[in-house]
């Protein structure tokens, strides 16, 4: 599924020719995919960002594209949205048709939905994402009119379904959420590698920048962005007040919050940041951002032997050779 914008109406128009890579005309709607390591704070960032954008008078659609289906829980005070895939299956079994009101919900100007996915061990999450976008098309996605469509994607998985926005130019730009730790920057680097790869194939998606979440001031994420060539859109501090409010499903991306200015600035940065082609790091380059003792750079690879694998002293036994007369 490829989404383009109709130049005359400024609205989203789907093109389900998966192989086409035609450059899209200028778009009114900014479609932005957010990637990051599981648990890094993508949903927290997006819920507060979308709320602030709505306060700024923008029309915002937030779509959770993670099988955990927890993107919208903070926005709705801990309540879970019925997912598109689950609702579609139930409606189909009952001989009914899915309507927008079955799967899309709103709060203070933010519209939100969850694509969902299969139950654990019972299907392919990436395929579920593709199927979810097909269902969105049937719901009239091409006629919806938003200033921003924010897609919350899992970043740990390299499956093509989760890479759909990058591979098929579904979005104009990507934002990565990370922190000052190796694991989250490893995922961010993988996302940058995917963007760079599809740019080589003629794609148009670029990285708009990084949001540093739980920033402890150690600087590894800043160093990563400097080397890869992407800007920092915001640095959300590792603050106990933020942690408590997030745990209590309290929105802080509002002008009434002491953190409102942070998300107001993030909203402006997200809107204005151009998509750029990143320069992903090698594994050694990524490890080089950290102190040697933190990543074990003094360790050498020692080859294992068959005897090691058997766990006992191994004595090679001679084989029985069979000799045939006249051979």
Summary of predicted features, one role per range:
Residues 67, 125-128, 132, 158, ...:
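Helical mechanochemical/support elements of P-loop NTPase systems and associated helical scaffolds
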């Amino acid at each position: 599924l490829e989404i383009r914008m109709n130049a005359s109406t400024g609205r989203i128009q789907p093109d389900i020719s998966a192989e086409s890579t035609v450059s899209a005309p200028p778009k009114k709607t900014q479609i932005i995919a957010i990637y990051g390591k599981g648990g890094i704070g993508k949903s927290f960032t997006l819920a507060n960002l979308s709320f602030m954008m709505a306060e700024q008078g923008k029309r915002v659609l937030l779509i959770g594209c993670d099988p955990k289906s927890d993107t919208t829980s903070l926005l709705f005070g801990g309540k879970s949205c019925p997912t598109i895939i689950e609702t579609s299956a139930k409606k189909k079994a009952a001989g009914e048709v899915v309507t927008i009101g079955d799967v899309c919900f709103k709060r203070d100007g933010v519209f939100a939905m969850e694509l969902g996915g299969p139950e654990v061990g019972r299907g392919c999450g990436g395929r579920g994402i593709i199927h979810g976008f097909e269902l969105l098309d049937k719901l009239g996605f091409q006629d919806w009119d938003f200033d921003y469509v924010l897609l919350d994607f899992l970043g740990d998985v390299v499956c093509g379904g989760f890479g759909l926005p990058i591979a098929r130019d579904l979005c104009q730009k990507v934002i990565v959420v990370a922190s000052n730790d190796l694991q989250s920057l490893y995922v961010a680097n993988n996302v940058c590698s995917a963007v760079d790869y599809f740019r080589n194939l003629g794609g148009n998606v670029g990285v708009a920048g990084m949001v540093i979440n739980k920033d402890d001031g150690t600087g590894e994420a800043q160093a990563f962005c400097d080397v890869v060539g992407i800007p920092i859109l915001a640095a959300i501090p590792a603050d106990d007040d933020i942690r408590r409010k997030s745990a209590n499903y309290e929105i802080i991306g509002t002008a009434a919050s002491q953190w409102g200015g942070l998300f107001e600035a993030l909203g402006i940065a997200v809107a204005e940041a151009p998509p750029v082609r990143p320069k992903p790091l090698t594994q050694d380059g990524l490890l080089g951002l950290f102190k040697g003792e933190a990543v074990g750079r003094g360790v050498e690879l020692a080859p294992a032997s068959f005897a090691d694998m058997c766990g006992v002293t191994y004595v090679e036994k001679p084989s029985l050779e069979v000799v045939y007369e006249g051979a």
